[in-house]
């Protein structure tokens, strides 16, 4: 079993993962020949070390610059890895270029407000009309400068994606430190915000945000009324050290060993983002997604689910195209792993996947087993998912 280290994080990883040099080494096709990662041994244990990449130019956005080039981020929706990128470019002999909204005289920025020192900034461009994000001009409740105590969010409309999120939400425990991934998992955050129960948990996003009303869609990674903002590399240090109780993440493919692929789908490179760091280090991982994809048709009513047409693309396959989450490593670390779909819930067992629950109205053979490339374990006491999950008048 292998761990992964870089200049700022160490993550529990397995040689099964596509980033291991004995597998793909993070390379996406045969044309990519340069080594990106190597195996090293520390205290008798194997790690994966990502090789440093020289950065020629870093184009970054801040809020305010003083005459010396010190940069503050008070209006930004997240700290992200802005400092790390600037430092990497500077230390590589590259250029660091910042766009800011305003420029102030020397000494007007307090030392505590400066997030990027002038020593590593080469160029400052002032744009008084810069937007907070491409969708929002400026919202001080997102940057954490002000609280919006009148904020109210509506529960998302019913859909099968919401039904999946409802079932996944039942895995929460009060006081958990949690992470929500993009897509179906972020609907869990929307439900918690609409219910007013979000403060029962410590919600985090890998961009560095803690607490608040997590935003979804194109604004994923931001929050209104956040309680804390740290740099993304520090957030991943926390994740890699085992700080997450539960992570809710999406999936593209799942195989019989519990491996998950999100990084290469139908031959198209999507990339893992922070998925590996989060999934392989959380104590509990709840994968959320539709059972199949492309063209599936459903009917719901009276707490029942009916599949009128299966999807054209199977997600439960004999072998995933690329391993972004290792079931083998999860077993080694005693992680609790669930796979939640609209029609079935699985869990990772000692050697394979076990079917835990099926949706009311679903035919086990026709709607589940015939739509999979492998046969999961099926317990004698197979349970039925709560019918309320499929009620379109339920708010959470």
Language-model region placement:
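Conserved phosphate- and dinucleotide-binding cores of soluble alpha/beta proteins
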Residues: 3, 7-149, 216-395
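N-terminal active-site beta-alpha-beta segment that forms phosphate/nucleotide-binding
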Residues: 145-231
């Amino acid at each position: 079993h292998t761990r992964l280290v870089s200049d700022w994080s160490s993550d529990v990883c397995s040689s099964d993962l596509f980033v291991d040099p004995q597998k793909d080494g993070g390379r996406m096709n045969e044309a990519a020949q340069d080594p990106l990662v190597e195996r090293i041994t520390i205290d008798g244990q194997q790690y994966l070390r990502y090789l440093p990449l020289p950065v020629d130019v870093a184009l970054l956005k801040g809020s305010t610059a003083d005459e010396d080039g010190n940069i503050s981020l008070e209006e930004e929706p997240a700290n992200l890895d802005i400092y790390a990128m600037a430092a990497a470019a500077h230390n590589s002999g590259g250029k660091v270029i910042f766009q800011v909204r305003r420029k102030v005289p020397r000494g007007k920025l307090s030392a505590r407000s400066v997030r990027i020192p002038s020593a590593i900034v080469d160029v400052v461009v002032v744009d008084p009309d810069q937007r907070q994000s491409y969708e929002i001009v400026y919202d001080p409740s997102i940057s954490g400068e002000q609280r919006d105590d009148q904020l109210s969010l509506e529960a998302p409309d019913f859909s099968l994606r919401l039904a999946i999120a409802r079932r996944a939400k039942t895995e929460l425990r009060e006081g958990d430190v949690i992470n929500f991934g993009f897509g179906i998992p972020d609907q869990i955050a929307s439900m918690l915000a609409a219910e007013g129960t979000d403060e029962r948990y410590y919600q985090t996003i890998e961009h560095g945000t803690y607490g608040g009303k997590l935003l979804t869609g194109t604004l994923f990674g931001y929050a209104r009324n956040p309680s804390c903002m740290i740099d993304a590399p520090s957030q991943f240090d926390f994740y890699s050290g085992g700080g997450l109780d539960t992570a809710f993440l999406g999936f593209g493919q799942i195989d019989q060993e519990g491996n998950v692929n999100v990084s290469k789908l139908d031959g198209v490179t999507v990339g893992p983002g922070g998925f590996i760091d989060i999934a392989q280090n959380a104590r509990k991982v709840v994968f959320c997604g539709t059972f199949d994809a492309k063209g599936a048709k459903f009917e719901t009513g009276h707490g029942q689910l009916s599949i009128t047409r299966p999807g054209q693309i199977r997600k439960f396959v004999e072998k995933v195209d690329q391993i972004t989450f290792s079931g083998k490593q999860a077993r080694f670390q005693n992680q609790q792993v669930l796979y939640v779909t609209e029609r079935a819930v699985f869990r990772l067992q000692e050697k394979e996947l076990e079917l835990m629950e099926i949706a009311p109205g679903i035919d086990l053979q026709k709607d589940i087993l015939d739509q999979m490339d492998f046969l999961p374990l099926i317990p004698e006491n197979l349970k039925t998912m709560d019918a309320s999950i499929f009620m379109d008048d339920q708010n959470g």
